[in-house]
A protein has these predicted regions:
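Residue-level detector of alpha-helix boundaries and kinks
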Residues: 88, 192-193, 218
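Membrane-proximal basic amphipathic "stem/tether" segments
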Residues: 1-29, 137-139, 152, 166-173, ...
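A detector of helix-start/N-cap boundary segments at the beginnings of structured domains
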Residues: 33-37, 195-196, 219-220
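The conserved 3'-phosphoadenosine-5'-phosphosulfate
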Residues: 64-71, 113-124, 143-147, 152, ...
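Soluble or luminal CAZymes and related metallo-dependent hydrolases
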Residues: 91-95, 193-204, 225
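PAPS-dependent sulfotransferase catalytic domain
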Residues: 8-199, 207, 214, 228-240
Length: 268
């Protein structure tokens, strides 16, 4: 039987032990914010579900998305105001370029979680996810059944991050495609595009690792598919490794964001 860590009686609610744990954790944690700084499509939304659902950390990823244009222009005031009322953040701008450095400066004594994924698997997911809403409208705005045309404002962050890679698809603008499958297949055949995307993805990981090289306690590198994910997060947060875990991995976005989507085991 696992030994229960000591907890102040004021947090001990037998009717809702998870709520008790969350209050205990958020009242006693010895760090400021926590940021998920993995690239998009590495499991950052699943990480958000865990941090919100298990640890009770306040988060709202749309806050960063809403002010991304300001951040791109070097104005962090709205973002800082939003994040002052939250404990965890992922997605834009934390998932982009070197914005983790700005977050580190704005919110000292914070923790950073870098979600990792096999490069080839990441690229496939990246292309599948952004093909319809970002890549196809840029290449061929009048493409067949293009019901996802996005305004230039909403594309700005994607172009700012992936402009060099999109330039490798420039010649496709002069082509006509009968179906989406033809266009997507043509993109997949462009080796330089794939290699450039993967190189940018891997280089960013290296930059993050270098930045935190002398601050190992501030950076956790994980894969969300790791069966020991919660143990590693617990230890990273200064908790006993086995204090809380979930019984099953998060399988799809339909259950994300809800505490009920995580079947947990709690020991205290």
């Amino acid at each position: 039987e696992k030994q229960k860590p000591e907890m102040d009686s004021k947090y001990n609610n037998q009717k809702n032990p998870l709520c008790s744990f969350q209050k205990y954790f958020n009242s006693t944690k010895n760090f400021n914010k926590c940021f998920g700084i993995g690239a998009n499509k590495t499991g950052t939304t699943s990480l958000n579900t865990i941090c919100k659902g298990l640890y009770g950390m306040r988060s709202d990823q749309m806050l960063g998305v809403a002010c991304i244009d300001e951040v791109l222009n070097g104005n962090y005031s709205t973002l800082k105001q939003h994040l002052n009322n939250h404990d965890f953040h992922q997605d834009l701008p934390a998932s982009l370029n070197h914005y983790y450095i700005a977050l580190d400066i704005l919110f000292p004594n914070s923790k950073f979680i870098l979600t990792l994924r096999d490069s080839n698997s990441w690229f496939k997911s990246f292309l599948d996810y952004y093909y319809e809403s970002k890549i196809k409208p840029w290449i061929y705005p009048k493409s067949i059944n293009n019901s996802f045309r996005i305004s230039l404002k909403n594309e700005k962050w994607f172009r700012a991050s992936w402009g060099q890679q999109l330039a490798l698809l420039e010649h496709l603008k002069k082509c006509k495609f009968k179906t989406d499958e033809d266009l997507k297949y043509s993109i997949l055949k462009i080796k330089s595009f794939r290699e450039s995307c993967i190189s940018a993805y891997e280089n960013r990981i290296t930059c993050i690792q270098t930045y935190f090289a002398e601050r190992e306690k501030d950076l956790l590198q994980v894969q969300v598919s790791d069966p020991d994910l919660c143990k590693k997060i617990n230890k990273f947060f200064g908790l006993p490794e086995d204090i809380i875990t979930y019984k099953a991995p998060i399988k799809n976005s339909a259950t994300r964001g809800s505490n009920n989507s995580l079947k947990y085991r709690l020991y205290y």
